[in-house]
């Protein structure tokens, strides 16, 4: 988004992305803890029956990162795609590339969810020893889940909406004497 000149959208996405990416990383840590340090997804499967809470919060993080409607990623990704589409000559190309990248993110994210939590257990380790994490690991997951669901809604208007101009005025501006950005279009 910074490369598109949409700095307010970039900061907004940085905040929303921080919630759901942290949620996905900590959820992965909860899975690794629950399966006793195994990290190979091919040796996992059907963990939903043993780790329901971790599965649900990982679903929340996945839905947010793929931009599912009304999750935090939906708001920020939509603004990035909109900013790319509104570029001059390159708008359509950049928009298509970002849409392809978003589709690839959705593919690998859902692949992880279905393989680890809903796939067939392959019997590589003792299934009975798999356990849900305790509250010390789950409480941060709940907090990040809340942010992954609602941060986009709460921060949208402040950081990228009608009131964002007042918020960003004086922080980010383009001087009338600077015209370096026009040479970028010539190179591209």
Go through the PLM ranges and name each one.
Residues 1-41:
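Alpha-helical multi-pass transmembrane bundles of energy-transducing inner-membrane proteins
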Residues 18-22, 104, 149:
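Hydrophobic transmembrane alpha-helical segments of multi-pass transport and channel proteins
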